Amino acid sequence: MLDSCLNPELAAEITCQPVRRHHVDGAVLYSDIMVPLALAGTGVRIEPGVGPVLDEPVRTASDVDRITQRNAGDSSVIEEAARLVVAELGDTTPLIGFAGAPFTISAYLVEGSPSRDHLSARAMMHSDPQAWARLMEWVADLDAAFLAA
């Protein structure tokens, strides 16, 4: 799934199909809330029947220090997908982008995979609120860079 999000031609085609077929009022860029993490070089994959799985969950302040050293990465694939969509749809159909909330993405980073109770994330929030805040700020910066693309 992430591979198709990171392929500009494929993402643009998937984005434009509903507009062509159903004449909807707007197009939503085909993506996933994990794409900003993938662009930043974080080991993340979507496992069928499970959802997002992180190669290295962020559990400690030193883990937060390590991951927050990464920058937003190369967003040219997202920029190209958006350019292709706009070229096809013109200025009459708005293109909408989206990103995951910093809390949601941070919880995935700490848990390492989907969780119903978020025990590890809640533990970090209470035991090390500064590390949690740094992680959320980093994710917010990733989201901002992604949405700007």
Q: At which residue positions do the language-model features occur?
A:
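N-terminal basic, low-complexity leaders that serve as flexible interaction/assembly modules and, when applicable
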Residues: 1-48
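Active-site-proximal, glycine-rich beta->alpha crossover segments in alpha/beta enzymes
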Residues: 45-149
